[in-house]
Amino acid sequence: MAFLGLFSLLVLQSMATGATFPEEAIADLSVNMYNRLRATGEDENILFSPLSIALAMGMMELGAQGSTQKEIRHSMGYDSLKNGEEFSFLKEFSNMVTAKESQYVMKIANSLFVQNGFHVNEEFLQMMKKYFNAAVNHVDFSQNVAVANYINKWVENNTNNLVKDLVSPRDFDAATYLALINAVYFKGNWKSQFRPENTRTFSFTKDDESEVQIPMMYQQGEFYYGEFSDGSNEAGGIYQVLEIPYEGDEISMMLVLSRQEVPLATLEPLVKAQLVEEWANSVKKQKVEVYLPRFTVEQEIDLKDVLKALGITEIFIKDANLTGLSDNKEIFLSKAIHKSFLEVNEEGSEAAAVSGMIAISRMAVLYPQVIVDHPFFFLIRNRRTGTILFMGRVMHPETMNTSGHDFEEL
């Protein structure tokens, strides 16, 4: 099973106090954000949800007017749509990925936290409910400890109590009027699960050539696989793409792995929305030997600089036009925090203790081997629509608790 939770915080303060939309727009947003994040964090893990960010920015657009709204629409790739048409698309897409009949679970929960006594336009509240199913809560931000506890409890309740301490009291003060919280929860079983008894301790070699010991899962099975050229002569100029579906085949994790001799940084500049589509269209179902780390990645991102780099700047200054949200013309967005957590394992959040190990060989085989023992790029996507739900990379896999497992080193 793989579990992924994604959580976003947007805080508003007062100074005086191909594919078609939305898939195409989200694909472009995904790649642009990824490139910005890798430029500012050379050797760090990356994890974010472009879907979550698109929904959060849709909420901000609902409250924006004039040049502020125009800037958001342009940066999000909505220029080809009629004004406001994007909200219907976002609502339909959100409803599709959270459908109860799906074989995976994906919940998107939104809430607007409002300072007691502060006026928010009724039409804005109605539109928030209509398009984003967003609730509204009144709080006293001057009581920052109580507010932080309240919001953290809300996040826990909407993520099966798996994520705690999203915000801290220092995120709020008496000048804070509004906080917009967006939480996404995803959980899915692999279509072909990894057997826990096949997991072994394995060396993961980082780009600086240091090594860390991690639990390495293993299975042979039929997966979507392809080899692609990176245009260089290093290590044959070939990299691997493996797509592992979740139950139901609608959602999958796509792994992109350079040859071990080639740092991931050499491959990353190639990543474009069109290339992601090419990978999806070119991989073929075949038998593959897969060695995949059992790992967790957790990351908190300050979205303010990232969004500014993408062209969204006005919402962060005192001249922001958010009069669709409130008649208070002094209001602007002061903080944007995006926190994500990813856990990938054999079959669940707690793998069963086992004994009786099965030997695993790295000798010659008749079909491809994908040995994920060095940094890799990944995304989680809807295979039917092509929509990217999550994107990231693993440079430093954090070892999960292996207590109770009799691992044997390969």
Curated annotation (Swiss-Prot):
PROSITE patterns: SERPIN. Serine protease inhibitor that inhibits plasminogen activators and plasmin but not thrombin. May be involved in the formation or reorganization of synaptic connections as well as for synaptic plasticity in the adult nervous system. May protect neurons from cell damage by tissue-type plasminogen activator. The keyword Secreted applies. Monomer. Has a tendency to form large polymers already at 41 and 45 degrees Celsius (in vitro). Changing residue 163 to I: Increases protein stability and decreases tendency to form polymers. No effect on inhibitory activity. It comes from Homo sapiens (Human). InterPro entries: Serpin_CS (IPR023795), Serpin_dom (IPR023796), Serpin_fam (IPR000215), Serpin_sf (IPR036186), Serpin_sf_1 (IPR042178), Serpin_sf_2 (IPR042185). Detected in brain cortex and hippocampus pyramidal neurons (at protein level). Detected in cerebrospinal fluid (at protein level). Predominantly expressed in the brain. Glycans are attached at residues 157, 321, 401, 403. GO terms for molecular function: serine-type endopeptidase inhibitor activity. Gene3D superfamilies: Alpha-1-antitrypsin, domain 1, Antithrombin, subunit I, domain 2. Keywords: Cytoplasmic vesicle, Disease variant, Glycoprotein, Neurodegeneration, Protease inhibitor, Proteoglycan, Secreted, Serine protease inhibitor, Signal. It is linked to Encephalopathy, familial, with neuroserpin inclusion bodies: A neurodegenerative disease clinically characterized by dementia. Additional features include intellectual decline, psychic seizures, progressive myoclonic epilepsy, and cerebral atrophy. Histologically, it is characterized by the presence of eosinophilic inclusion bodies (called Collins bodies) throughout the deeper layers of the cerebral cortex, leading to neuronal death. GO terms for biological process: central nervous system development; peripheral nervous system development; positive regulation of neuron projection development. This is Neuroserpin. The record marks 362-363 as: Reactive bond.
